[in-house]
From Swiss-Prot:
This is Pantothenate kinase. Pathway: Cofactor biosynthesis; coenzyme A biosynthesis; CoA from (R)-pantothenate: step 1/5. Keywords: ATP-binding, Coenzyme A biosynthesis, Cytoplasm, Kinase, Nucleotide-binding, Transferase. It comes from the Bacteria. It comes from Rhizobium leguminosarum bv. trifolii (strain WSM2304). CDD domains: PanK. The gene is coaA. InterPro entries: P-loop_NTPase, PanK, PRK/URK. ATP binds at residues 109-116. PANTHER family: URIDINE KINASE. One of its GO terms (molecular function) is pantothenate kinase activity.
């Protein structure tokens, strides 16, 4: 099924380029998207790409050339336009000595779909622009409520769902970033112990660009009673990206990652999931399937996938974990 069919519900037999007029998006195959690279230089090496990719993600230099150089060029245009608007507004308001606040890029998508790889690759590419911008990357993992809180509130089985995050803390963090405040603290998270690390933080000090990555960053929220204005996380984004793939593919990637982790991280005695290292393959497959069906699939359908149409750019992956289609919101 084409990405256009999924987003706008046109008949599957309708070619996704013909459906362009029915949608707020332009649709491109990966081959067409690659042509927008123009003369954007490749500034990463093969070894660097291997270091940046997540477990099970086969991204290589060819994928960077096909997809990420064009995306880097697009984002460069958006950042430059934002800077021009900033300068024009300052002239309009007769302001001087005002520092441009960070350009914030949000990246959303399911678990195991490759958000972290995309975020890390973009961080490196954007930081190597000729202008040498300062680029920081923060994930929403650190904004999860600590396990002790989730256990007390009986939310451990809903970890990753919107209610498991300290949304107020996320909004405070992004507000401080957009206000241009120095040395803003982002809480740290350990995937080894599967918990927020108390009193450990990443310091974000007025970057030119901030990449903010997490499964629910495009999540909307119900309007509160009484008309009180409550911002959404995405209100702070200058550009947003959704990493997409078919449910069955994400399921396969999730299970495959779980099985690989049994042979690596889970073997660490300090791992929260160490108990899974010694079970049989059959038991591990059953547990991974249950975790997917009862937690991650539900979250995808209820909370993550419905946010896809809110993204400025959608990158759709195929069965080989490589991007096959691109949808870019029209201006």
């Amino acid at each position: 099924m084409s990405i256009a069919t999924e987003i706008i519900g046109v008949p599957e037999t309708l070619d996704h380029f013909q459906s362009d007029s029915y949608s707020p998006y332009h649709f491109f195959s990966s081959e067409q998207w690659a042509k927008f690279r123009a003369d954007t230089p490749l500034t990463l090496t093969s070894d660097e790409v291997k270091r940046l990719r997540s477990m099970g993600d086969p991204i290589d230099l060819d994928e960077v050339r096909r997809i990420y150089l064009s995306l880097s060029r697009l984002l460069s245009a958006h950042v430059e336009s934002s800077q021009m608007l900033f300068e024009q507004r300052n002239r309009f308001l007769s302001l001087s000595d005002v520092t441009k606040t960070p350009f914030v890029i949000g990246i959303a998508g399911s678990v195991a779909v490759g958000k972290s790889t995309t975020a890390r690759v973009l961080k490196e590419l954007l930081g190597r622009w000729p202008s040498s911008p300062k680029v920081d990357l923060v994930t929403t993992d650190g904004f999860l409520h600590p396990n002790a809180v989730l256990q007390r509130e009986k939310l451990m089985q809903r970890k990753g769902f919107p209610e498991s995050y300290d949304t107020a803390a996320i909004l405070r963090f992004l507000s401080a970033i957009k206000a241009g405040q120095p040395d803003v603290k982002a809480p740290s998270y350990s995937h080894l112990v599967y918990d927020v690390l108390p009193d450990e933080y990443k310091i974000v000090d007025r970057p030119d660009i901030l990449i903010f990555e997490g499964i629910n960053v495009l999540q909307s929220r119900d309007l509160p009673a009484g008309g009180k204005i409550v911002p959404m996380v995405s209100d702070f984004f200058d550009f947003s990206i959704y990493i997409d793939a078919a449910e069955d593919l994400i399921h396969n990637w999730y299970v495959a990652r779980f099985m690989r982790l049994r042979e690596t991280a889970f073997r660490d005695p300090n791992s929260y999931f160490h108990r899974y290292a010694s079970i049989s393959d059959a038991e591990a497959l059953e547990i991974a399937g249950d975790l997917w069906a009862n937690i991650n699939l539900k979250n995808l359908r209820q909370n993550i996938l419905p946010t896809r149409p809110r993204a400025d750019l959608i990158l759709k992956k195929g069965k080989d974990h490589l991007i096959e289609q691109v949808a870019l919101r029209k201006l």
